[in-house]
A protein has these predicted regions:
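Sec-type signal peptide cleavage vicinity
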Residues: 2-8, 14-337
Length: 337
């Protein structure tokens, strides 16, 4: 299935809510609504740009009567936000504030399928696969009286992963001939010898997942997925036939666990090429991150996107990396010789 940045399809699902609470709701009750903003965020592929009617964001909204704890929820369900912090969104089946006027606490998770978040308590955990954006919105509080006055909570969704985009280019015709097609790209290392993580735990009260401590479950190899200049696909970059040219072109992307970068050996990519019926050539390429001024990038990569340009030379592969939106942070380059 091909996905272009963000699907315009807004999926609404039935929200669950306590029948006891609803039975106490009098006529003229006030509906629970919320607004949303997103920091340059995509749906299952990376969410890009600003929330709008043509670029909606469907998220899971959890509602609790207990500050910071969503084990026992007042309501939960999907809300589809269609603009950036202006228009309120509702649950598919309207839900209402408690008749006693007590305060409610709301937080947001993306993707919107609650089942994928495991057992929800003060936190929620999810395994990610490289093609799915993970976002969270910190807890907000709201009450019936505030809603009656026209004040609704605004949920700000933030990226919790790091986006890597790989561009491929051959230095010259000799390199094209020497390497053949690129067949496989994967992430096999981070911060030198460490393996990449594949699971995140989000603290719901503040909507955070601290780089390092909130990530777990290492894997030997983490997938990249095919893409073009403007389209993200959910097809793994495995057994592909990507033809090298002398013009750099987007080839693959992955949404990976963030790291604390040092600017040396930040990521390690495994690149496989094959020329005709020859045996495949496998290379591991270290990627050193650079910032937007082409100096060494150090620090947290969460919420940032890096563009990695792999240059194939007749004798080696070289890598460079640079940052692009989501949040501009830097670049990386590499050569394959």
């Amino acid at each position: 299935m091909k996905k272009v940045f963000l699907s315009a399809l807004a999926i609404a699902a039935m929200a669950s809510c306590s029948k006891t609470e609803l039975s106490n709701t009098p006529d003229g009750s006030v509906e629970i609504k919320a607004k949303s903003t997103a920091l340059s965020i995509s749906t299952k592929s990376p969410y890009e740009g600003t929330i709008s009617s043509g670029n909606p964001l469907t998220a899971q909204v959890l509602v609790s009567k207990t500050d910071g704890n969503y084990t026992s929820r007042y309501c939960d369900g999907e809300m589809t936000f269609s603009d950036d912090g202006t228009t309120e969104a509702s649950f598919a089946t309207p839900q209402y504030y408690p008749a006693d006027g007590s305060v409610l606490y709301l937080c947001g998770l993306y993707p919107s399928d609650l089942g994928g978040w495991g057992t929800v308590t003060e936190s929620a955990s999810r395994t990610f696969d490289g093609k799915t954006d993970i976002m969270a919105a910190a807890q907000q509080q709201s009450s019936k009286s505030e809603a009656q006055a026209g004040t609704y909570p605004t949920m700000q969704f933030k990226h919790l992963l790091t986006k890597l985009v790989v561009k491929l280019v051959a230095e010259d015709d000799a390199a094209v001939t020497a390497w053949g097609n690129v067949t496989d790209i994967s992430l096999v290392g981070v911060n030198g010898s460490q393996k990449p993580y594949s699971k995140v735990e989000v603290t719901l009260q503040d909507g955070t997942a601290v780089t390092g401590s909130a990530f777990s479950t290492t894997v030997e190899s983490f997938s990249f997925y095919t893409m073009t200049e403007n389209t993200y696909n959910d097809v793994a970059f495995s057994a592909q036939t990507f033809a090298l040219t002398k013009t750099a072109a987007n080839a693959a992307y992955s949404l990976v666990a963030p790291i604390t970068a040092t600017g040396s050996g930040d990521f390690k990519l495994k690149i496989t090429t094959q020329k005709n019926a020859d045996s495949p050539l496998v290379n591991e390429v270290a990627v050193d991150l650079k910032n937007t001024s082409n100096s060494t990038f150090t620090g947290d990569t969460q919420g940032k996107a890096f563009e990695i340009t792999l240059t194939f030379k007749a004798t080696e592969i070289q890598a460079k990396a640079s940052v692009k939106e989501w949040e501009k942070a830097g670049t990386a380059t590499g050569e394959i010789k």
